C-alpha cells in the first residue's frame, strides 16, 4: 500500500497510511492560514487545489484564483514532488497534516520543531508491515 513518508534525506521517521492529505500552516508574518491538497502517487506528491485566506508578504494570489467562502482557491500544474521539503523551526510554528477528516500537527509524528533539525521531507512510499517497531505508522 502506498502512503506518506516523513523524514529527511531518505531516512524514514514516520509513515502515514493515506493516499490523500492536506498540508496546512499559518504564514509567519501575515498570520493567514494556507492549505494545499495532495495526492500520493508512486511518482511523488501531486498538488491538487490550494487555498489561502488572504494575501501579503510572499503570498501573492495566483492569476485565475477564485474567492469562495472567504478563501482564494486555485490550482497549479506542477510535476509530482518527490520529495516535498518543508522548513520547520520553533520560530515559524508547525504544519498540520489533515486526512480522514482530522488534522494533527506534524509534532504528533515527529515531536516539536527543533532548531537543530530545521527541515522535514514528505514523499510517497510503500508502507512497511505494521509489525515493525520503527518507523512508526499512525
Region spans (language model):
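N-terminal secretory signal peptides
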Residues: 11-62
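Short N-terminal edge-element motif at the start of the domain
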Residues: 1-6, 12
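Hydrophobic beta-strand residues in large extracellular and virion-surface proteins
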Residues: 4, 23, 45, 97, ...
Amino acid at each position: 500500500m502506498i502512503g506518506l513518508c516523513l523524514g529527511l534525506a531518505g531516512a524514514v521517521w514516520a509513515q502515514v497510511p493515506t493516499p490523500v492529505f492536506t498540508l496546512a500552516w499559518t504564514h509567519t508574518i501575515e498570520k493567514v492560514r494556507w492549505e494545499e491538497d495532495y495526492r500520493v502517487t508512486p511518482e511523488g506528491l501531486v498538488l491538487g487545489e490550494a487555498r489561502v485566506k488572504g494575501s501579503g508578504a510572499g503570498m501573492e494570489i495566483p492569476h485565475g484564483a477564485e474567492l469562495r467562502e472567504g478563501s482564494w482557491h486555485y490550482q497549479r500544474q506542477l510535476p509530482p514532488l518527490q520529495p516535498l521539503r518543508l522548513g520547520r523551526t520553533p520560530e515559524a510554528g508547525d504544519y498540520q497534516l489533515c486526512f480522514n477528516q482530522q488534522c494533527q500537527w506534524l509534532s504528533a509524528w515527529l515531536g516539536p520543531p527543533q532548531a537543530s533539525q530545521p527541515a522535514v521531507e514528505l514523499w510517497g512510499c510503500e508502507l512497511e508491515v505494521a509489525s515493525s517497531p520503527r518507523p512508526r505508522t499512525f
